[in-house]
Amino acid sequence: MVRSPVPAAIVFDVGSTLVREDRYWASWADWLGVPRHTLSALVGAVVAEGRDDAEAIRLARPGVDVRAERRAREAAGCGERLEESDLYPDVREALGALRALGMRVAVAGNQSARAGELVRALGLPVDEVATSGQWGVAKPDPRFFAHVVDLARAAPHETVYVGDYPALDIRPAKAAGLRAAHLRRGPWGHLWARTADAALADWRVDSLTELARLMGTGTGASRSVG
């Protein structure tokens, strides 16, 4: 087998890629006064229909102003926060291994500017962190991926974008000329693992540990999803 060159840069999505979202939605359920399982099921239902996950909040409390509720949560000390325990267990080791390969490692996802600050505060072994809130444009907009290329400081074909949500992460990344890795974890990673969008990925993995190993061995073929 011919060993492929290690890509110059790799950029990671945040939610369900680096960070578990369990506590985030649990805190929203508690704030709204609905059972956690109820809100979790609503989130799954609206996203499966291709709608924004904020619609789950509106279904749980009809007529609610989500932006106003976010401000109220912040004022009450219940706003966005991110802790070490919110990271998936493989994150630090895998990011460190990728940097050790000489890759530029960055983070860029559909999050608020505040969430970007929280990710930076974790001190992950990455070169840079950016968010859609910072850029003023979100996935799957091609302009988001133009920013990703700038963040990577590498040509699109030498840059890998990693995410769990094929329609937001894989398809638009490939359309922008990047390489892409689909991470099969979190609700959306499992739900859409067999879609045409997921099949576009250059790599299809179940963990960041597996991805780092494949990068290190120069394996470029997509793995099958059984």
Locations of regions flagged by a protein language model:
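Asp-based, Mg2+/Mn2+-dependent phosphohydrolase catalytic module
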Residues: M1-I10, R92, G96-G226
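N-terminal helical cap/lid subdomain that shapes the substrate entry/recognition surface
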Residues: V2-M103, S112-G116
